[in-house]
């Protein structure tokens, strides 16, 4: 990327998922930030501001819901220019968003006199098209504002950002599906080390557990098929312009089988891609005996 190539980051997503933190983070990175700009004014903003401030961040949400249809027309036109565009979509689980609204004592903009959950569900429907087109999806359900800021700074800092990252995540279904996952694989069909007394307190990071999980013929066969599938799929996602691919591997609690497979897949692809391994429910796993 040329140093002076104009850049536009579109920040969107669920109300309460962290757009204010995101906008503050982009200001710290030297972006010219505009909140709630009608999409039809984007070309004029870029033309006027882009001459002196080549990095622009714009937050668009359901406050501009009357302009959502026009946004996608403008977005497709801008993609045909020399402008480098990335769309960041911020999301969080419904229960987390409801809690945040109650803590802030604010009503949801789409349900000012009703339950926040009603507004959240309406908003998800309205923003579905944005989520599908976003190059980067961040689930803020289980992270604090400072951690979100650090993640944004790392992702968008020039010279440090990795063009394409494969995020391999283990998780437990009983703790909820990861909202930012692109691919989800269910490992609950494999024999569960939880029922082996000496393995129960351990995790997939322990050799005894990983050896137990991978010893079964069905585990070996599934692993081979999974590697073959990812070898095909990862380049397809990269070609689509995504900045990352989140591969989520789940078992019941996120403690044994999912961690074993996440570690194995990470090692399998570490020499081909920039790999980030995230054991989402590891803290829960260590607490469970």
Swiss-Prot record:
It holds the Pfam family RapZ-like_N. The keyword Cell inner membrane does not apply. Keywords: ATP-binding, GTP-binding, Nucleotide-binding. GTP binds at residues 61-64. ATP binds at residues 13-20. GO terms for molecular function: ATP binding; GTP binding. It comes from the Bacteria. InterPro entries: P-loop_NTPase, RapZ-like, RapZ-like_N, RapZ_C. The keyword GTP-binding applies. Displays ATPase and GTPase activities. Belongs to the RapZ-like family. NCBIfam families: PRK05416.1 (NF003828). HAMAP family: RapZ_like. This is Nucleotide-binding protein Exig_2405. It comes from Exiguobacterium sibiricum (strain DSM 17290 / CCUG 55495 / CIP 109462 / JCM 13490 / 255-15). The lineage of its organism: Bacteria, Bacillati, Bacillota, Bacilli, Bacillales.
């Amino acid at each position: 990327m040329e140093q002076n190539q104009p850049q536009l980051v579109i920040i969107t997503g669920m109300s309460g998922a962290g757009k204010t933190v995101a906008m503050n983070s982009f200001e710290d990175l030297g972006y010219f930030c505009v909140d709630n700009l009608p999409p039809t004014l984007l070309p004029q903003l870029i033309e006027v501001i882009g001459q002196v401030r080549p990095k622009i961040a714009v937050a668009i949400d359901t406050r501009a819901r009357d302009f959502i249809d026009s946004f996608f027309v403008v977005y497709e036109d801008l993609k045909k220019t020399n402008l480098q565009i990335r769309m960041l979509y911020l999301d969080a689980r419904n229960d987390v968003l409801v809690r945040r609204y109650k803590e802030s004592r604010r009503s949801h903009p789409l349900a000012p006199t009703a339950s926040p959950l009603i507004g959240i569900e309406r908003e998800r429907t309205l923003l579905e098209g944005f989520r599908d087109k976003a190059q980067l999806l961040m689930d803020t359900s289980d992270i604090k504002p400072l951690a979100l800021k650090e993640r944004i700074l790392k992702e968008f800092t020039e010279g440090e950002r990795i063009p394409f990252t494969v995020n391999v995540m283990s998780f437990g279904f009983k703790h909820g599906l990861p909202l930012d996952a692109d691919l989800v694989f269910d490992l609950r069909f494999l024999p569960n080390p939880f029922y082996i007394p000496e393995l129960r307190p351990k995790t997939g990071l322990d050799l005894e557990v990983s050896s137990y999980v991978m010893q079964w013929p069905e585990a070996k066969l599934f692993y081979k098929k999974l590697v073959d599938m990812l070898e095909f799929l990862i380049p397809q996602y990269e070609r689509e312009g995504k900045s990352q691919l989140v591969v989520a591997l789940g078992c019941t609690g996120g403690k044994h089988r999912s961690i074993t497979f996440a570690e194995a897949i990470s090692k399998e692809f570490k020499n081909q891609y920039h790999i980030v391994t995230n054991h989402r429910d590891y803290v829960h796993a260590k607490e469970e005996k």
